[in-house]
Amino acid sequence: MIKTMIKRCTVLVLCMVITFGLFGCNLSVNNGKRIVRIAIAQSETHPEYLGLVAFKEYVEERLGDKYEVQIFPNELLGSIQKTIELTQTGAIDFAVAGTANLETFADVYEVFSMPYLFDSVESYKAVMQDTDYMEKIYESTDSSGFRVLTWYNAGTRNFYGKKAIN
């Protein structure tokens, strides 16, 4: 039963991380390279940060003559909410944030905070991988000056209590 409950709460995983992009961001250039700035709240040992390092390596190996990727971990540039605001102003290009932070910009993200929204990991992935459906949700922040680009599963959440939850 607990396993089923955890699976049903998988959507809360999405609350962990979603990557945003900004429309018309400030184009910072260093030595002829376009600088791409990414803010993340996690430490340098966290899997999300390590994923960004892999992204940086991928981009710079293939496009290193055109792009330099800078990653700012540990809320170095401010809280998650502040980094979202930095994408809005163009000070940075991307912020890694959860859907709870997006709720203030688009009500549609409140649905992802609902427990038991999905009855299985498979149903969760089926919805999240439906690009036409998710694109409509991602577009909901356009009027706020940024676009959600994607999602990824960062694990499951747990419920704790004195009595069994059935």
Spans of model-derived segments:
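Generic structural signal for residues in well-ordered beta-strands
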Residues: 69-71, 148
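Extracytoplasmic "Venus flytrap"
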Residues: 37-54, 74-78
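Alpha-to-beta junction loops
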Residues: 64-67, 83-97
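Contiguous mixed-secondary-structure segments that line small-molecule binding/active-site clefts
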Residues: 56-60, 98-166
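Short, low-complexity disordered leader/linker segments with a strong preference
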Residues: 1-35
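Immediate post-signal peptide segment of exported/extracytoplasmic ligand-binding proteins
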Residues: 26-40, 60-68, 142, 164-166
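Short helix-initiation/N-cap motifs at beta->coil->alpha
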Residues: 72-85, 154
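Extracytoplasmic/secreted proteins, especially bacterial periplasmic and envelope-associated proteins
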Residues: 47-54, 58, 82, 86, ...
